[in-house]
Curated annotation (Swiss-Prot):
Pfam family name, one: Transketolase_N
The EC number(s) this enzyme carries: 2.2.1.1
Name of the gene: tkt1
Binding site for Mg(2+): 155, 185, 187
Residues that coordinate or bind thiamine diphosphate: 66, 114-116, 156, 185, 261, 438
Protein name (database record): Transketolase 1
Any one of the GO BP annotations: pentose-phosphate shunt
Length: 665
């Protein structure tokens, strides 16, 4: 039997070799955490390399994602479909082993990590999902949801502010199945961290309500194993295991220094490390006995088979719950979804209401929520303003995790990355909310959702200068454009309750990308529509008002400015002008339509166009051309009543008509 140290050295060797072959990467963390990884993965982690998507597997997150050769080595050694050639292709174009772990590339990668602090935050989301699913589905004698979430994180993760947001909430929610390992090696890129990171981390986490196991020797397998056993035994609090490690362990001349953090060791140092570790094998060569000791395929298959037997017994005793669990974990919508939601939208069109689109959003939640037990909502301490709670909302707490609504507190970034974790875990359709202005705090987590192609629905209310007296600190200007310009992001700014419901429906159906739903504070007039127009809302842009024959002018508007465009249309039409109004709640959805549809809505021959939106003006040139005009924002807002601000910045019928006449002259 191979010694534990040699099993860990296999990780060190592969990590050194992979980084060296790529001529870039981070060997220090994988070499420093190899002993911890060996104990966790071989003695504790419940997983099946032959089915990386087994629903009740333990989750493992490498929050310090720069140490990616660690997880690639673990996946390869354990028997996942990640070959030695894949490891040799580390950091190369179209490889399964990119520089930072990316969800969807190599099997067994649970989340994309790299921006520090977001991995631990995703893990908090996964642990919340596990606790909530267990509370909703487990029955006495039938624990079908019962798994741990393990995280590796470094000093950088703990310095990032998002780690405070996430770990504070994790303590409050009593996430007893969350176990984090702090790689306490005292080194970051700039050198020894005591000059910029002198926190008492154990006391910090104790203050959060965590179970803290301090001063564990990260190179002592028995000490590591005992710490993990103690962590698993603590069921009411998350655990932080503080592991003291040597970065680059095994490198005789670079271990313990920043020299091995983010650069290849070099051939000479790798040779010296091999001698120091007693690793006598060639680069990328793993002996058969090491492979055999690491191989988790048979053990994993046995664990999943045992769970399948448990689930079969559960299904026999609780057939309805078992069917519902399978539906939700598979990410399937209820069978009656399409018919029920289409009827809801038709009824909204037939019963006009002039309400704020944030209220329209709440009405959509009320209607759709009754169909979706998988909804998991929340807000960053703005529920009464975002209107994200509905009659079926039940708060999720440490004592009762069967709820479907998370009070995130004032933690926009944490909320958004936690929701990424909930979505990655599966079993829920998660949404969060804040003011549109404060998506700025959460921007990178939404970008990560788009990069990973996961469902993260964000409700952004108070969407413009219409916010009024709170002033420019709270009035978004450039935020909508930045969301629209994010690849794989679906952004909607509806003009009334019907467009709002359609936006919600599509966001719920869109499993492979995040959605930003942008709503107003102020009341908006509902627009009359035909059934065909209602159907065309889903296309992102459609003709709302039209003239006989070819228009001479097209007004394009979104959200609260649609009624402004309609008022100008009516005045111009009464004066004999041939005008069309295009409502464009989602530019990305419109851009995905075929050329014929886009030409039918915005004919190339009609060059006189005005875009109207209380957001940054520059975005709209792609739709109006340089010969068109934009009534939009070119500065920050002001503190004043909303009506005065709309007048000040030109969002009036008079100004739209004036601009139109100048363009037509």
């Amino acid at each position: 039997m191979s010694s534990r140290k040699q099993l860990a050295n296999a990780i060190r060797a592969l990590s050194m070799d992979g980084v060296q072959k790529a001529n870039s990467g981070h060997p220090g963390a994988p070499m420093g955490m190899a002993d911890i990884a060996e104990v966790l993965w071989r003695s504790h982690l419940n997983h099946n390399p032959q089915n990386p998507n087994w629903a009740d597997r333990d989750r493992f997150v490498l929050s310090n994602g720069h140490g990616s050769m660690l997880i690639y080595s673990l996946l390869h050694l354990s028997g996942y479909e990640l070959s030695i050639d894949d490891l040799k292709n580390f950091r190369q174009l179209h490889s399964k082993t990119p520089g930072h772990p990316e969800y969807g590339y190599a099997p067994g990668i649970e989340t994309t990590t790299g921006p520090l602090g977001q991995g631990i935050t995703n893990a908090v989301g996964m642990a919340i999902a596990e606790k909530a699913l267990a509370a909703q589905f487990n029955k006495p004698g039938h624990d079908i949801v019962d798994h741990f979430t393990y995280v590796f994180m470094g000093d950088g993760c703990l310095m990032e502010g998002i780690s405070h947001e996430a770990c504070s909430l994790a303590g409050t929610l009593g996430l007893g199945k969350l176990i984090a390992f702090w790689d306490d090696n005292g080194i970051s890129i700039d050198g020894h961290v005591e000059g910029w990171f002198s926190d008492d981390t154990p006391k910090r986490f104790e203050a959060y309500g965590w179970h803290v196991i301090p001063a564990v020797d990260g190179h002592d397998a028995d000490a590591i194993n005992a710490a993990i056993e103690a962590a698993k035994a603590e069921t009411s609090r998350p655990t932080l295991i503080c592991t003291k490690t040597i970065i680059g362990f095994g490198s005789p001349n670079k271990a313990g220094s920043h020299d091995c953090h983010g650069a290849p060791l070099g051939n000479d140092e790798i040779k010296a490390a091999r001698e120091f570790l007693g690793w006598e094998h060639a680069p990328f060569e793993i002996p058969a006995d090491i492979y055999a000791a690491w191989d988790a395929k048979q053990a994993g298959a046995s664990k999943e088979a045992a769970w399948n037997e448990k689930f079969a017994a559960y299904a026999k005793a609780y057939p309805a719950e078992a069917a519902e669990y399978k539906r939700r974990v598979a990410g399937e919508l209820p069978a009656n979804w399409e018919a029920a939601t289409s009827e809801i939208i038709a009824n909204l069109q037939a019963n006009p209401a002039n309400i704020a689109s944030r209220k329209a959003s709440q009405n959509a939640l009320e209607a759709f929520g009754k169909l979706l037990p998988e909804f998991m909502g929340g807000s960053a301490d703005l529920a009464p303003s975002n209107l994200t709670m509905w009659s079926g909302s039940k708060s999720l707490t440490a004592e009762d995790a069967s709820g479907n609504y998370i009070h995130y507190g004032v933690r926009e970034f944490g909320m958004t990355a936690i929701i990424n974790g909930i979505a990655l875990h599966g079993g829920f359709v998660p949404y969060g909310a804040t003011f549109l202005m404060f998506m700025e705090y959460a921007r990178n987590a939404m970008r990560m959702a788009a990069l990973m192609k996961v469902q993260n629905i964000q409700v952004y209310t108070h969407d413009s200068i219409g916010l009024g007296e709170d002033g420019p600190t709270h009035q978004p200007v450039e935020q909508i454009a930045s969301l629209r310009m994010t690849p794989n992001m679906s952004t909607w700014r509806p003009c009334d309750q019907v467009e709002s419901a359609v936006a919600w429906k599509l966001a719920i159906e869109r499993k492979d990308a995040p959605s930003a739903l942008i709503f107003s504070r102020q009341n908006l007039a509902q627009q009359p529509r035909s059934a065909e127009q209602v159907a065309n809302i889903a296309k992102g842009g459609y003709i709302l008002k039209d003239c006989a024959g070819q228009p001479e002018l097209i007004l394009i508007a979104t959200g609260s400015e649609v009624e402004l465009a309609v008022a100008a249309y009516e005045q111009l039409s009464a004066e004999g002008k041939a005008v069309r109004v295009v409502s464009m709640p989602s530019t990305d959805a419109f851009d995905k339509q075929d050329a014929a549809y886009r030409e039918a809505v915005l004919p190339a021959a009609v060059t006189k166009r005005i875009a109207i939106e209380a957001g940054i003006a520059d975005f709209w040139y792609k739709y109006v051309g340089f010969g068109g005009r934009i009534i939009g924002m070119t500065s920050f807002g002001e503190s004043a009543p909303a009506g005065e601000l709309f007048k000040l910045f030109g969002f009036t019928t008079e100004n739209v008509v004036k601009q139109a006449k100048e363009l037509l002259a």
